[in-house]
Curated annotation (Swiss-Prot):
It catalyses: coproporphyrinogen III + O2 + 2 H(+) = protoporphyrinogen IX + 2 CO2 + 2 H2O. This is Oxygen-dependent coproporphyrinogen-III oxidase. GO terms for molecular function: coproporphyrinogen oxidase activity; metal ion binding; protein homodimerization activity. Its EC number is 1.3.3.3. It is found in: Cytoplasm. It is an enzyme of class 1 (oxidoreductase). GO terms for biological process: protoporphyrinogen IX biosynthetic process. The active site is at 108 (proton donor). Keywords: Cytoplasm, Heme biosynthesis, Metal-binding, Oxidoreductase, Porphyrin biosynthesis. Its main location: cytoplasm. Its cofactor is a divalent metal cation. Residues 242-277 are annotated as: Important for dimerization. It comes from Aeromonas salmonicida (strain A449). PROSITE patterns: COPROGEN_OXIDASE.
């Protein structure tokens, strides 16, 4: 395995955060990200950037963090005893965008790197990440575009990579208590160290950059589409599922909250408004019903 270059990964992640914020500000036209730089007591820190009340983006956050320490928390080494007694570094960019317009899907992306080192031993390292789309009023052409970008960026790394990481995404973003996917998926990967460091890093970069290629054209197509109170109410109802997933299943959220992470940055992914309604059912044959029948179960899009 080629030796990991931690500084190179960090430089890319900082640049990626800048690039994503710049592109989303452009797409919004009015809103600006406000930065909150923070430090972690045990070592490290980050840059949390949040946009609120933009023209297209109701609320969105793009977070960079880089934390390190002399030993992993017990909760992290319980199922990975080989990490015990090693100093560690973890860094990543994660983002969630909640648009105003119900015809523009919510999107999420994350790329991260982890390394644990011990004097006289080989470092243990891996990459993780992915991106996924959560439409409220889906258009097949948008979902196909999202998955086409996903497939194309995976192609140079092997024919089997897109099907593997697409399927992992479908399994991961699944609400068991609702028996539905969170959205229409995309890519998800973790523990990636199957190739030399340079190749794994190149894949993580492709995913990070691919997010904008996948999302920006959908924003442009849908952001001016007229909507009314009915669509807004449904958007808020479906956002409730986003909250349920993040608080019940999301590994990053749970790990962060359980290990004394920065709560404001961890909960940045929450929508600004959401609603619940007892035993709500969509009207048969309605656009809302179409989401349930055609989009909230894993399927092949290409």
């Amino acid at each position: 395995m080629s030796k990991p270059d931690v500084a190179q990964v960090k430089a890319f992640l900082l640049q990626l955060q800048d690039e994503i914020c710049r592109s989303l500000e452009q797409a919004d036209g009015v809103g600006r990200f406000v930065e909150d730089a923070w430090a972690r007591e045990g070592g490290g820190g980050g840059r949390t950037r949040v946009m609120r009340h933009g023209d297209m983006i109701e609320q969105g956050g793009v977070n960079f963090s880089h934390v390190y320490g002399d030993a992993m928390p017990a909760s992290a080494t319980a199922h990975r005893p080989e990490l015990a007694g090693r100093k560690f570094e973890a860094m990543g960019v994660s983002l969630v965008i909640h648009p105003h317009n119900p015809y523009v899907p919510t999107s999420h992306a994350n790329v991260r790197f982890f390394i644990a080192e011990k004097e006289g031993e080989e470092p243990i390292w891996w990459f993780g990440g992915g991106f996924d789309l959560t439409p409220f009023y889906p258009f097949a052409e948008d979902v196909q575009h999202w998955h086409r970008v996903s497939r194309d960026l995976c192609q140079p790394f092997g024919e089997d990579i897109y099907p593997e990481f697409k399927s992992w995404c479908d399994r991961y973003f699944f609400l068991k208590h609702r028996n539905e996917t969170r959205g229409v998926g995309g890519l998800f990967f973790d523990d990636l160290n199957r190739w030399p460091f340079a190749d794994c890093f190149a894949f993580m970069q492709a995913v990070g950059r691919g997010y904008l290629d996948a999302y920006l054209p959908i924003i442009e197509r849908r952001k001016a589409q007229p909507y009314g109170e009915r669509e807004r109410e449904f958007q808020l109802y479906r956002r409730g599922r986003y909250v349920e997933f993040n608080l019940v299943y999301d590994r990053g959220t749970l790990f962060g909250l359980q290990t004394g992470g920065r709560t404001e940055s961890i909960l940045m992914s929450m929508p600004p408004l959401a609603r619940w309604e007892y035993d709500w059912q969509p009207e048969a044959g309605s656009p809302e019903a179409l989401l349930y029948t055609d989009y909230l179960a894993p399927r092949e899009w290409l």
